[in-house]
Amino acid sequence: MINFKKQIMKKTTFFLCAMLLVSSILIAPRSSLAYPFWAQQNYESPREATGKIVCANCHLAQMPTIAEVPQAVGADSVFKAVVKIPYKDDIKEIGADGSEVPLQVGAVVMLPDGFKLAPQERWTDEIKEETEGVYFTNYSEEKENIIIVGPLPGDTNKEIIFPVLSPNPATNKEYHYGKYSLHIGGNRGRGQVYPTGDKSNNVIFTSSSAGTINSIETIEDGSYQINIENENGEITTEAVPVGPKLIVKEQDQITVGAPLTSDPNVGGFGQLDAEVVLQSPYRIIGLIAFFIGVGLTQILLVLKKKQVEKVQAAEGI
């Protein structure tokens, strides 16, 4: 009887936890499912064949992203890939509920095959301090060379440090020394389009028809319905969600594609490529040996020249 009660309690607890998880997913506003999770859910790879990172499909505005990586790294070594996501301080954007919220940022770093996020036991104290509060995830279980971060509070994360571990060709013959490319993307703010193709409330809304604005209705949740009457007396209704500010009024004459709202977007996405050389230790040793050889040759030439000068002086030449 006691075991039966325990089983009932376990099943009840599991059921409640499952319901809580499902409810949190369904009830959570769309902004909580922001970059980069939708990219993971909708694209096998974050980079298209054209070279475009898929985040640009939803984040239509372009803004700069800066990356700093070492020119060369050694095998089986930890180095920092720094992604900078600049924007003006104290900027706020429109949240999914129409309220003003601080900007969030995110980044994706596509490393060459064999490179991956360095294990935490190999992080230096400096890296641990610089990455405090930052949670790194792989794009998928099969792609550990693709690291994503975000969304994070933008005010304190305009510079994101990625600790990267390089491969060792000496122990894994799949990898080789040489030059490799990295593909990097950085985003600030919400997107303008959802992966479903629907507009978010972080974009300009335009008219799909020409005519006169017959009426503007304010809905209980703060959104609008704009009724446009064309020259034939037909009414087209444009729905504007809560957030964007209307720039039209009743009796305004508008054309197809005319803006109905201001542009609320203050963010944007940017991508770039970088290069890093996986340096062979034998090449470094060879380079050092070459410089030593050149130095010794120069010294021998100077000594030989002085010897010749002494002989010439002795012979009175």
Swiss-Prot record:
GO terms for cellular component: plasma membrane-derived thylakoid membrane. It comes from Prochlorococcus marinus (strain MIT 9515). Its main location: membrane. The gene is petA. Residues 1-34 form the signal peptide. It is found in: Cellular thylakoid membrane. GO terms for biological process: photosynthesis. This is Cytochrome f. Its cofactor is heme. Heme binds at Y35, C55, C58, H59. It comes from the Bacteria. The 4 large subunits of the cytochrome b6-f complex are cytochrome b6, subunit IV (17 kDa polypeptide, PetD), cytochrome f and the Rieske protein, while the 4 small subunits are PetG, PetL, PetM and PetN. The complex functions as a dimer.
